[in-house]
Amino acid sequence: MPANRSSDDSTLHLPRILCLHGGGTNARIFRAQCRILTRYLSTAFRLCFAEAPFLSQPGPDVTSVYKEFGPFKRWLRSSARDHPEIDPALATEAIDASLRDAMDEDDRRGATGEWAGLLGFSQGAKMCASLLLRQQVRDATRTSPSARDGPNWRFAVLLAGRGPLVSLDPACLTSPAVVDAGGIAMTAFPDERLLAAGTAHVLRLPTVHVHGMLDPGLEEHRKLLAQYCEEGTARVMEWEGNHRVPIKTKDVVALVGHVLEVATETGVLQRRI
């Protein structure tokens, strides 16, 4: 079965969420990791899983369960030693092509719902937030929203996401608070004085942040929320887990509640009376 294929044709008409896997995994693995979440969202959303464009070593703990699920992929460079330099514009083109391929394939399978949201884990969460930021800064320069040449992303769900965000359109966004698409994904956060010097990097579109309280990167995830999201636009879910996608029923139900709330507030879903 192709990585982004849904086995349930009853979701073809539903609004869609594009899902971006973490570094060192792939769309097939992320679909498996999100299997419980997909089930609980299946009455409201269709989830589509995109595959990153660049080859990668497997991520931490990936081979213990998914050793036979390669090849493993990444959206960004994780290290200068393991991943060759790439021109930022070419990197952005490759990322956009991967997203477009997944969306086009889902269209060919008969899906008709609007592309409404983004959902990503770890490096994929960084990319989701960066895609929202690109849309935000591009919309600010347009004379009309109808001039948008892609999906209208209403919200993003960020599981274990960290900054800094990535500028996917340097012509619209140049800020010391963001890095380019050819940079190293694990770059340290900019100095707080640089972050405080402007607001071009600050997301105002709605986000849901999912923080595992046992995740070694928890403080970095909290920094993404505090330094890159406008107050009042984000909601946070904390759960007793490490660096992984929640699968226990109580955690998934809580996460689904946040997704449905933000989808209703943004007009993707109708408010229940």
From Swiss-Prot:
Induction: Expression is positively regulated by the azaphilone pigments (MonAzPs) gene cluster-specific transcription regulator pigB.
Taxonomy, superkingdom: Eukaryota
GO BP field: secondary metabolite biosynthetic process
InterPro entries: AB_hydrolase_fold, FSH-like_dom, LovG
Cellular component annotations (GO), alphabetically ordered: cytoplasm; nucleus
EC id: 3.1.2.-
This protein's UniProt keywords: Hydrolase, Pigment
Enzyme class: hydrolase
An example Gene Ontology molecular-function term: pigment binding
Practical uses of the protein: As colorants, MonAzPs are widely used in various food products for centuries. Moreover, MonAzPs also possess wide-ranging biological activities such as antibacterial activity, preventing hypertension, lowering cholesterol levels, causing hypolipidemic effects, and displaying antiobesity and antitumor activities.
Catalytic site: S122, D215, H243
Pathway assigned in UniProt: Secondary metabolite biosynthesis
Coiled-coil parts of chain: none
Described purpose of this protein according to its UniProt entry: Esterase; part of the gene cluster that mediates the biosynthesis of azaphilone pigments (MonAzPs), a complex mixture of compounds with a common azaphilone skeleton very widely used as food colorants. Within the pathway, pigG may assist the nrPKS pigA in the biosynthesis of the hexaketide precursor. The first step of the pathway is performed by the nrPKS pigA that forms the hexaketide precursor from successive condensations of five malonyl-CoA units, with a simple acetyl-CoA starter unit.
Family of this protein: Belongs to the LovG family.
UniProt-recorded name of the protein: Esterase pigG
Species this chain originates from: Monascus ruber (Mold)
Gene giving rise to this polypeptide: pigG
